[in-house]
Regions:
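Gly/His-enriched, cation/cofactor- and phosphate-binding structural elements
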Residues: 2-122
């Protein structure tokens, strides 16, 4: 819809390539970008909250075309920033670094670019 387009246009997404397909990264407090990007066919979406520093990485659900697994990304990010709280969802399709619901979680010091570099390599 139009609203989607407006939201999309105000956000500067960074597009990158992964072995699973195209990814896109955002620095925004707007969580709807993840759903929008997935609708547009991005296999991997990263959102970093510029205020709190938290990161969310999501992949598309398993399909004939793609079956992404964030385990190696999780291990690599844990090595790079062991202080931060990293949580790999049981389905291996979602990697969270802190949520608003858990105030004890420590946001990562890594920049969005650092995280994108890992996603490009792994």
């Amino acid at each position: 819809g139009n609203m989607d387009q407006t939201v999309w246009n105000t956000i500067n997404g960074r597009i990158f390539e992964t072995r699973y397909g195209k990814g896109i990264g955002f620095e925004t407090i707007n969580d709807t970008v993840i759903k929008l990007a997935q609708k547009m066919g991005y296999v991997l979406v990263v959102r970093k909250d510029p205020r709190k520093g938290y990161v969310r990485i999501k992949t598309l659900p398993k399909s004939d075309k793609v079956d992404a697994d964030l385990t190696l990304v999780y291990e690599q990010l844990k090595k790079m920033d062991p202080e931060a709280t990293w949580f790999l969802h049981v389905g291996k399709k979602m990697l969270l670094n802190g949520t608003a619901k858990n105030p004890k979680m420590i946001p990562t010091k890594l920049k969005l670019d650092d995280i994108i570099k890992v996603l490009e390599k792994v």
